[in-house]
């Protein structure tokens, strides 16, 4: 067992007390990104090492691996802690997204170590999609590079508002304050082009030597700010979904017996309480929340991010992919949207193509009407293109086969994020972030009775070969 972990358990008074304490700590998900060989994996290894999160057998194995694959001479190569693939160790680069967990007395952390190479942009986007903070590493010898700009843009595109610019390898520039100041000014000039209201912080450090990572550096007396670990422990993450209106995508209809019918899913945003009047979209039927069922028993209210089962007072037609929201909220269904797309397939995305898409538990089809532009993510300029290639990022116009209830991705990642699925191979070929829902469905729910809508839904669900049209979306 890790000696530090054993000491923590002893201080808490046993394993059970330690586990309870862990549950009540806040969790921060962050990623490390930057140019090739800026020291991302070394930084994570240093964090794990200096916070005493490495087990004794791992440390022994690290000594052996450092002799075989290490790049730091006689020193421990801490990057090998996270470069787990054999190809990564042999090439000295990161290819896949590596996830690591560690905790301190103040907070729990999940780290995503993302690749820096341009051909692995899709891997980096995947890692960033679940994170709340990004550490952007910059080599003090090289300054701000194209890949630094690219990763900054992708991070902000995926909704990350907190950026920590870690200027690494300060030991190789004699811990120069002038170098740090110059790089800081260069990055701030570039950051003016990034979207959103960003929280940007700068930390000069040396991941190899441990300067300003978990402890203050004696080699940089001119820097009086917090260490990287102190920033991670104290940064306040304001979750956007907490302040957004209620959104509950139904993932599963739970009917274990004749006496129970519940709708299971994760509350995407807002809060819900017993007795609240809710509306089901796209049908528009309303009901009241009778119970909120959780693993720990019934609750009176639930909040964003919690997995719950809702029981309604009325038996109405609700299926996987439907969305529950407050009854007094007017949120129209749309059949078109402009979407920021990160393309992940060898075959380019072209106008006229159709794909299965999945959004908030609902699966339908979408047609690519056009590509407005592709972003040159090295300088953030926009250019017209005929198709979107592998690792390309651009703004695309989509038309859906049926009305969907969408939010902008920056407001709600669950109801604003989607994936593209190839209809033949069933492989995920792209990720999309709703930029703007652009047109309303024209059918009015009041033109059909509740019975007609439920019968139509029943036929389409159980007899798809009949080709019945959607009464709400095909008019």
From Swiss-Prot:
Assembly behavior: Heterodimer composed of CysD, the smaller subunit, and CysN.
Organism of derivation: Escherichia coli O9:H4 (strain HS)
UniProt-recorded Gene Ontology molecular function terms: ATP binding; GTP binding; GTPase activity; sulfate adenylyltransferase (ATP) activity
PANTHER family, alphabetized: TRANSLATION FACTOR (PTHR23115)
Pfam families from the UniProt entry: GTP-eEF1A_C (PF22594), GTP_EFTU (PF00009)
Region G2, residue ranges: 92-96
Domain tr-type G stretches: 25-239
Catalytic activity entry: sulfate + ATP + H(+) = adenosine 5'-phosphosulfate + diphosphate
Stated name of the protein: Sulfate adenylyltransferase subunit 1
Family statement: Belongs to the TRAFAC class translation factor GTPase superfamily. Classic translation factor GTPase family. CysN/NodQ subfamily.
Region described as G4: 168-171
Pathway info: Sulfur metabolism; hydrogen sulfide biosynthesis; sulfite from sulfate: step 1/3
Region entry G5, spans: 206-208
